[in-house]
Amino acid sequence: PLYSSAASDVYKRQVGRNGSGKTMLFRALSGLMKVDSGAVTLDGRRLHKDFEMLPGLGIMLENAGLYPDLSAVDNLSFLMGINKKPDIRIIKEYISRVGLDPDDKRPFRKYSLGMKHRLVFAQAIMDNPSILLLDEPTNSLDEGGVSLIRELVLNMKDENRIIIITSHNREDIDMLADVVYSMSDGRLTKV
């Protein structure tokens, strides 16, 4: 098993070269991808069936689930509306938290890469998930964006969550990780 059990006060971190399987692992953990064998379990309980999103899960994959022709508010409203009635006040709060203007009406496709990355992060955290999977959370960000995302992640670390992060950024690893795993050819090794 990847983790025989997970304590919410433990911060896991994976590192590895491009193509080593980190993003694929996140897709399997989240239920977005069918796995050939095995199951995702937490404390001995199977968390989901294939292609069924884990309840209480926030996941950040590059541009995942966001629509190019919708504004930030419309994108997050649509995603929040899948499970419950969207609360525009909360949506705007999360857009502001990641340093974006909630009143910006531009479509997502017109955002810079860093702005897109911030919105994907907001999408991952807006339902206050108990388990958070973050794939390269500071990638494509300027210095201010990196500091902001690191601060948000550190704050969430103190809120009784399970957080698993992939990164190539050594500074992120040193600052954010309690436990580090390296991934090579689809295999995890504790560092």
Identify what each model region corresponds to:
Residues 77, 88-103:
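Conserved ABC ATPase "signature" region
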Residues 38-53:
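Conserved ABC transporter NBD signature motif
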Residues 167-168:
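H-loop/switch region of ABC-family ATPase nucleotide-binding domains
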Residues 1-11:
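Single conserved hydrophobic/aromatic residue that forms the stacking wall/gate
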Residues 132-136:
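Catalytic Walker B motif of ABC-type/P-loop ATPase nucleotide-binding domains
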Residues 30:
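Helix-to-loop junction immediately C-terminal to a conserved catalytic motif
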